[in-house]
């Protein structure tokens, strides 16, 4: 622009790009009602009228001027760049739902039987002329955008067509990066404590009171939360100390008054007042209905967060894990009082390393200190949790999921265990609720029920709740998944001690070790895993029942965790790809287990969500990484395309849905899961605002394997087998198809 030239005042279209975040796109600057001066969307368009009054023009010809119709066909040429003027958001939403949402679930999907078209006004004509929005995808995006606009209090909006027909791959990536992660982020502080402390999972009088338990050695946190409760008595917040030694008996005693467990906080100084206050580190939760920090979910979500450059949140979750190990003795299933005895699959070393690298690596002294604190905590967890009774099996030298605990898990539905309890209630001639109270109080002793709950708690600790692979036996299984993770701990600790800490580290107990010590532990575990878990004939790593001294034969996708951890030999990896993979590779990626291993499903033996035909993001991501590490990048790419296809297909056809798990055998409605708890992320009205944590990560990570050609195929929802069939030979090689 020439100097001295006045700058043209921007129109709405010039202020924001069509893919900006909702707070910008639907912010005050784009509200047509708040424009201080007329712009091209608020001025009335006039029509040129040529009358036949001039003798010059009428000489020999009569000009019949046709009025341009209100259906703005002239704009079709600019399709994709148009802007729509919605002058009444509420009314348009009502019309859209009445016309298109024929099943009344506040979503527009391929199952609705509406006309799949809606007339909306154009922005250039101030809504005078109209165009058609057609098809399930655009109409469902319109529903989503109008729902968001309404949530922002907007009565009128200018909508870019580009936002409605956005490439689905780009749209889902954008939503995950700029909206879903933000919606899933939590932080425990004065403003949020009441909402986060509230617990909907436990239905007892004591659970209705928001309550937080603070570790014995955290007086600053205790005073902080006491101050929170005093500053706002309406919160009705209870603040309580935990004892220095936490026993299963004490944990059970808290079940009538369950509460949130405090997490890591840091001191911040107010730049205005100069006063210091505590602020909780941020973390993300698995889904919108959760408020707790979960164990292995956090690692898998951190992978996506780091790729989206949200390092502060990933770092915050590592800080919370360090805090949990220091004060609660372990990384918890989640930070609620009834989880104090239960851990989850351990991923801390890899998580800390990945954050460290994004945090500046060894060039950043703060990052080095962070890494050291994380690994000292990991060593404590390794020794005191996984290599100690009751989880460590001395005979095999391997570890099991085997948490402590007494009585019924309080976070379950009241009638969840009625079937198993009925015969015991009848035996004692009492009702099921009465028996439950008697059992929890220790008034009756039932060894069979004790063992049932032992394995039930172990299944929950494994993260795979539930599966017939683990049911009624989990606490006795040295699983391939857990022992792969512990091998990774040993290798990671050896690497970090050697590379960053001068080959020496002193742990919480004052014991100093070197990298060779940890390498030796890893070598021993690798030998034992091969001895007890590897089956050369089938190409699977199985689990080993330490109670009866026998290897199982349940085909599970967790076999690939051995490749993720790097413990498999190249020959074992080759065998897994040749023999195990064909049994687990389905239309939409890896299935949790084979149909043969799962067995027959009946009324008395219903589906389990971690079994066939369901696929889970953790299994996909760990397998992709493992296969890639062993030179099977093409196989990883093929599996990633299959998984991304399912996600994209459901996202396009079902109103932007992103769910916890998918049926990897179905190409039409893969999000539909009937097993056990249903499917988290499916129950929303108008717009999905969070997705599901580790599934969000899987989409971000899976796309790293895709080139432009594959992304276009995904955007068109091209079925994997059709996509693979029509590839050129060089492309087929990239997917290990030839």
Swiss-Prot record:
Chain intervals for the UniProt region annotation (Disordered):
1-44
Instruction: Please tell me whether the keyword Hydrolase is annotated for this protein.
Output: yes
Naming one, the record's GO cellular component terms include:
cytoplasm
Checking InterPro entries in the record gives: 6-hairpin_glycosidase_sf, 6hp_glycosidase-like_sf, Glyco_hydro_37, Glyco_hydro_37_CS, Trehalase_Ca-bd
Q: What is its EC number?
A: 3.2.1.28
The alphabetized UniProt keywords are: Glycosidase, Hydrolase
Residues at which substrate binds: 289, 296-297, 333, 342-344, 463
Q: Which GO terms describe its biological process?
A: trehalose catabolic process
Q: Which PROSITE patterns match?
A: TREHALASE_1, TREHALASE_2
Q: Which SUPFAM superfamilies match?
A: Six-hairpin glycosidases (SSF48208)
Hydrolase is among the record's keywords: yes
The reaction(s) catalysed by this protein are: alpha,alpha-trehalose + H2O = alpha-D-glucose + beta-D-glucose
In this protein, the active site sits at 465, 660
Q: Name one GO molecular function term.
A: calcium ion binding
Q: Which family does it belong to?
A: Belongs to the glycosyl hydrolase 37 family.
Q: What is the protein name stated in its UniProt record?
A: Probable trehalase
Q: Which organism is it from?
A: Eremothecium gossypii (strain ATCC 10895 / CBS 109.51 / FGSC 9923 / NRRL Y-1056) (Yeast)
